């Protein structure tokens, strides 16, 4: 508690830094994965290669990637951009599969019927495919949220500030309270963001509960 | 009028789904395509609104080849009812019905008003307007499907096994209601079913489709029942089934109609 009292300021600062890395990566992965997932569902032949490719991405160890991305893109190794790009790669690797599954889960009959009554492809994507994909997509997004919030901490090894900094610093200086604080707040952030996903999902899919209630 | 002119559709592997099919659906009439599954009847139906384009031959609506029309606009001008209504599960009843007027450019309040009127037309309570499809019975979903198809007052109605997913009693009442609606609306209806009794109940003209869309016989329900063109039609219609071979019996002065096995069906009015 003594450590906490003396370091509330830096704890808050690192929490904000943590969120500033995790949230953009999560949102970016969603923006990237949705069109890929939708295309994979429409072009059957593209589905397996696309999923295999993103599967390989996930197999790359994270630490080397934190070092490799700055070299390839010519950005600072300790920059936020580096962390966000690396986190986005892993988040996208998970999210593409979820998005492809989500679009496959849209009932064929709903898609057929939308086309039959005169939706254009573009209009159908926004009005039918995307809303009906939300439940499965959300399940994937929740995994992405939790894993990304956790993965942010790895960046502290190469000096990108986040709650992970409390692990490295606390470990080096032998302050157990600092390590514990980093751990607890990281888990809390994951839980809060996960809860926000659940609430957003409920608000966006009133029909799903109507079907359950019946 | 819808005209099929020597229409053929081949699958990617070259095998025909329908081969060299010609027939017409006269304006304001109900034509029922009836055949077993895989006969190509749904493929034929989908050629009308360009969900499927023929490999060769033409489909004409009022003498205009549909392939010259924009598919999206064509579909908005044609009512379409699918099995179990084909409702969008994430839209309420009133939203589902209002979709087509909205797509055709009606304002939101106008489309909504139109949708509520359509609920009356198909005999549904306006209280159902804000429910989701999953909260309706199968029969109610079908009625909403019909309401949606009629919402933009199209000339043509395509119905693909629309009553296939409801129980026989509800199906019979839906068939009855469709007949009543058609009496006042006079749409040009192309209806697909595998149920010959449904065809007999609804059709001005029945087209019996064998494999690959080959037309085994076309005629009025009475013609099909009394003069089946060949053994296939006779078998399909079931002219030898006990319930088709009716007899008259006398029950204490009342003339009773029975089937071939003697089960009573109704009484005879002269």
What label would you give each PLM region?
Chain B
Residues 49:
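Helix-to-loop junction immediately C-terminal to a conserved catalytic motif
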Residues 65-79, 103, 108-109:
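ABC ATPase NBD coupling module
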Residues 157-161:
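Catalytic Walker B motif of ABC-type/P-loop ATPase nucleotide-binding domains
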Residues 132-136, 140-142:
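Conserved ABC ATPase signature
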Residues 146:
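Hydrophobic anchor residue at the start of the ABC signature
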Residues 151-155:
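A short, proline-enriched helix->beta-strand linker immediately N-terminal to the Walker B motif
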Residues 94-102, 112, 116:
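Short helical segment in ABC ATPase nucleotide-binding domains corresponding to the A-loop/adjacent helical element
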Residues 109-127:
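Conserved ABC ATPase "signature" region
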């Amino acid at each position: 508690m003594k450590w906490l009292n003396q370091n509330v300021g830096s704890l808050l600062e690192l929490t904000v830094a943590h969120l500033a890395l995790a949230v953009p990566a999560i949102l970016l992965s969603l923006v990237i994965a949705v069109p890929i997932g939708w295309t994979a569902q429409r072009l059957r032949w593209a589905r397996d290669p696309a999923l295999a490719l993103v599967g390989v991405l996930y197999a790359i160890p994270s630490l080397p990637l934190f070092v490799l991305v700055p070299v390839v893109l010519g950005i600072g190794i300790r920059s936020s951009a580096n962390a966000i790009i690396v986190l986005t790669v892993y988040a996208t690797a998970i999210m593409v599969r979820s998005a492809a599954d989500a679009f496959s889960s849209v009932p064929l009959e709903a898609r057929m019927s939308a086309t039959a009554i005169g939706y254009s492809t573009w209009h159908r994507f926004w009005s039918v495919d995307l809303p009906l994909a939300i439940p499965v997509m959300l399940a994937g997004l929740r995994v992405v949220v939790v894993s990304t919030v956790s993965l942010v901490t790895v960046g502290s090894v190469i000096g990108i500030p986040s709650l992970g900094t409390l692990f490295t610093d606390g470990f080096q200086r032998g302050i157990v309270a600092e390590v514990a604080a980093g751990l607890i707040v990281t888990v809390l952030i994951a839980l809060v963001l996960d809860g926000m996903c659940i609430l957003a999902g409920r608000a966006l899919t009133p029909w799903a509960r109507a079907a359950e209630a019946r | 009028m819808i005209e099929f002119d020597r229409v053929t559709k081949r699958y990617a592997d070259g095998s025909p789904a329908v081969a060299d099919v010609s027939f017409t659906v006269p304006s304001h009439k109900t034509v029922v395509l009836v055949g077993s599954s895989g006969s190509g009847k749904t493929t034929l139906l989908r050629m009308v609104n360009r969900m499927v384009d023929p490999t060769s031959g033409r489909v004409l609506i009022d003498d205009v080849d549909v392939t010259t029309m924009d598919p999206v606009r064509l579909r908005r001008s044609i009512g379409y009812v699918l099995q179990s209504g084909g409702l969008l599960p994430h839209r309420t009843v009133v939203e589902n019905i209002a979709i087509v007027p909205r797509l055709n450019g009606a304002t939101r309040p106008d489309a909504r008003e139109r949708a509520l009127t359509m609920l009356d037309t198909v005999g549904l309570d306006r209280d159902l307007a804000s429910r989701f499809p999953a909260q309706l019975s199968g029969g109610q979903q079908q009625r909403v499907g019909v309401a949606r198809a009629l919402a933009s007052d199209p000339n043509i109605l395509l119905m693909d096994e629309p009553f296939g997913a409801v129980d026989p009693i509800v199906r019979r009442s839906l068939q009855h209601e469709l007949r009543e609606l058609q009496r006042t609306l006079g749409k040009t209806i192309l209806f697909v079913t595998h149920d010959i009794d449904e065809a007999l109940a609804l059709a001005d003209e029945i087209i019996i489709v064998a494999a690959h869309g080959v037309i085994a016989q076309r005629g009025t329900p009475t013609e099909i029942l009394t003069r089946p063109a060949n053994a296939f039609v006779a078998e399909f219609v079931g002219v030898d089934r006990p319930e088709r071979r009716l007899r008259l019996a006398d029950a204490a002065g009342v003339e009773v109609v029975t089937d071939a096995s003697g089960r009573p069906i109704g009484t005879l009015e002269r």
